[in-house]
């Protein structure tokens, strides 16, 4: 008869080795809570089951989650080829291939229930959703179209800020889009922003924070300058929840934090309340 062996729990090092041997597609680590989870557990909405953080989604997937139908506008608009920086032009081509878009924002007219609205969704796979001249032009055209047609606008923001390769031309888009937003507001029309991770830089400093109703996904990073830049400037370490959606909500900068699976229903309810109709959604 063989003697019984005592069970020994694996050491941290053994666990680390086992994790390293797990196929990449099987597990996903949340960038916010740093917990590992099975990729299939993220579900169709790609949400961390531990902290509700929403992983970054392609623009077209966002559109499918938020609308019943969608008609894209200005699909061919892209950065002018007059830029004389070969490295930048090469980056643009890689971004187009990765995102299947010609620019860092997808714009068009969407429908949800009986409501029609302008929709802009920023694409992080296109140079981190950076704000370039063509990006600003597409968003401006969206607001101008919706002002003419008396439609509300919904913007889903996700950006690293103004596109540095385009210099002042990119920075000018902040004022350009803000003017279009102001004209839309003067016409008495609704503007809803949905801030997602990350919304930073010139996008935060302009149209992302100009919504009449401002929503955000849980744990989204929202700010202007990056954390390291701020640390070096003030010579202090900001708190762990610095620039997170929950902190902005607590300080009055947001109206509501909405989990990704509930965004469509919340948007429909807001359109019902503001555009007229039965509130049975």
Curated annotation (Swiss-Prot):
Binding site for Zn(2+): 30, 33, 48, 51
KW Transmembrane helix (keyword) present: no
Pathway linked to the protein: Lipid metabolism; malonyl-CoA biosynthesis; malonyl-CoA from acetyl-CoA: step 1/1
Catalytic reaction annotation: N(6)-carboxybiotinyl-L-lysyl-[protein] + acetyl-CoA = N(6)-biotinyl-L-lysyl-[protein] + malonyl-CoA
Renumbered zinc finger spans (C4-type): 30-51
The name this protein goes by in its record: Acetyl-coenzyme A carboxylase carboxyl transferase subunit beta 2
Gene3D superfamilies to which the protein is assigned, alphabetical: 2-enoyl-CoA Hydratase, Chain A, domain 1
Keywords noted in UniProt: ATP-binding, Cytoplasm, Fatty acid biosynthesis, Fatty acid metabolism, Lipid biosynthesis, Lipid metabolism, Metal-binding, Nucleotide-binding, Transferase, Zinc, Zinc-finger
Domain CoA carboxyltransferase N-terminal, first and last residues per copy: 26-281
Cofactor binding: number and manner: Binds 1 zinc ion per subunit.
InterPro entries the record matches: AcCoA_carboxyl_beta, Acetyl_CoA_COase_Trfase_b_su, ClpP/crotonase-like_dom_sf, COA_CT_N
EC identifiers of the protein: 2.1.3.15
Record localization: Cytoplasm
GO biological process per UniProt: fatty acid biosynthetic process; malonyl-CoA biosynthetic process
Similarity annotation: Belongs to the AccD/PCCB family.
Physiological role: Component of the acetyl coenzyme A carboxylase (ACC) complex. Biotin carboxylase (BC) catalyzes the carboxylation of biotin on its carrier protein (BCCP) and then the CO(2) group is transferred by the transcarboxylase to acetyl-CoA to form malonyl-CoA.
Cofactor: Zn(2+)
Quaternary data: Acetyl-CoA carboxylase is a heterohexamer composed of biotin carboxyl carrier protein (AccB), biotin carboxylase (AccC) and two subunits each of ACCase subunit alpha (AccA) and ACCase subunit beta (AccD).
Domain of life per record: Bacteria
Gene, per the UniProt record: accD2
GO molecular function ontology, one term from the record: carboxyl- or carbamoyltransferase activity
UniProt enzyme class: transferase
Matches recorded under HAMAP family: AcetylCoA_CT_beta
């Amino acid at each position: 008869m063989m003697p019984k062996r005592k069970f020994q729990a694996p050491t941290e090092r053994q666990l680390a080795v086992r994790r390293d041997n797990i196929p990449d597609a099987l597990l996903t680590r949340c960038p916010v809570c740093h917990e590992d989870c099975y990729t299939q557990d993220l579900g169709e909405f790609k949400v961390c089951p531990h902290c509700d953080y929403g992983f970054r989604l392609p623009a077209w997937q966002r559109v499918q989650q938020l609308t019943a139908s969608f008609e894209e506008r200005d699909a061919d608009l892209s950065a002018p080829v007059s830029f004389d920086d070969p490295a930048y032009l090469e980056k643009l081509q890689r971004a187009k291939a990765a995102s299947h878009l010609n620019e860092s924002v997808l714009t068009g007219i969407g429908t949800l229930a009986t409501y029609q609205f302008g929709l802009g969704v920023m694409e992080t796979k296109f140079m981190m959703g950076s704000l370039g001249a063509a990006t600003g032009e597409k968003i401006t055209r969206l607001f101008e179209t919706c002002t003419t047609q008396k439609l509300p606008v919904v913007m889903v923001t996700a950006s690293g800020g103004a596109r540095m390769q385009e210099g002042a031309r990119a920075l000018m888009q902040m004022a350009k889009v803000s003017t279009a937003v102001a004209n839309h507001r003067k016409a008495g029309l609704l503007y809803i922003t949905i801030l997602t991770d990350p919304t930073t830089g010139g996008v935060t400093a302009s149209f992302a924070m100009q919504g009449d109703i401002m929503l955000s996904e849980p744990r989204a990073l929202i700010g202007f300058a990056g954390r390291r830049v701020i640390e070096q400037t003030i010579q202090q370490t900001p708190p762990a929840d610095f620039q997170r959606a929950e902190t902005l909500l607590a300080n009055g900068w947001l109206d509501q934090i909405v989990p990704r699976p509930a965004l469509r229903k919340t948007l429909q309810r807001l359109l019902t309340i503001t555009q007229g109709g039965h509130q049975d959604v």
